[in-house]
Curated annotation (Swiss-Prot):
<dbReference type="GO" id="GO:0062040">
    <property type="term" value="C:fungal biofilm matrix"/>
</dbReference>
<dbReference type="GO" id="GO:0005773">
    <property type="term" value="C:vacuole"/>
</dbReference>
<keyword id="KW-0732">Signal</keyword>
<protein>
    <recommendedName>
        <fullName>FAS1 domain-containing protein CAGL0M08734g</fullName>
    </recommendedName>
</protein>
<dbReference type="InterPro" id="IPR000782">
    <property type="entry name" value="FAS1_domain"/>
</dbReference>
<dbReference type="InterPro" id="IPR040200">
    <property type="entry name" value="Mug57-like"/>
</dbReference>
<dbReference type="InterPro" id="IPR036378">
    <property type="entry name" value="FAS1_dom_sf"/>
</dbReference>
<feature type="signal peptide">
    <location>
        <begin position="1"/>
        <end position="16"/>
    </location>
</feature>
<keyword id="KW-0926">Vacuole</keyword>
<feature type="domain" description="FAS1">
    <location>
        <begin position="84"/>
        <end position="248"/>
    </location>
</feature>
Amino acid sequence: MVALKYVLVPVALVAAKNIVEMITFRDENGKLHRRLAPEEYRGGVLDGEESRLLQKRDLEMHPPVDLGVYFSNRPIHRTIDVPDIYLDSQISVLTELDIFASYSRNDEKSYDMFRDPESDLIVIAPTNAAITALAKKPWQFPMDIDTMEQAGSSERDIDNAIHNNIVNFVRSHVVAYQKDTKTSKDGTVLLQSKQYSMQHSNGKGGDVLLKREGEKYCVASVVDEVFHDVQNIYSTKNGVILVIDATLSRPGA
């Protein structure tokens, strides 16, 4: 089957809660298609404060995420000063994370957790540069969208595959904070991303490695165990954002 050659035309640009911004275009045969808009088409970010859930977090009853508990042999009881901000608002204002933030907003369940004052999350956020360096865009893998198009898959099946790819990518970078997670002898902690926990209901194993070297943290995927330095840490009331110049999910991995 001959692959379709697509010609973009300015028909429409759509932004919705459940899908990434899409651009509508015609192929060379005149058939309409919807696909994710290139990064340069992206509109403004959602205002996290406008969508804030009404309740607030009680930090005395429910202390914020503390990565230090993973690397201590005894219980830690300390007060952590965190800004009056939640994950959704924090990630929306970090320009170095614009692309990941855009994808996360289109995984409704993950973004709801970012807004939830009762969440305890570790968000391992790839920089814009890390995502653009991938051989394929996050919406194009692990389900191969080009192959589906060439095979004549329906628009609905392709749109569902795109959404599932986005969910896979986002949740591969979101970890539920668990204080009782044990540290291995080499000082490494094995964590479960939301994507991993969805696929492994027995609660065993993990797919994300966290390590501390002095005052610095590093993270890796269990697939290659290549550690990447955490460039910045942003603490919020319901989690922390660890910025890395890499992705934990890659095409073909």
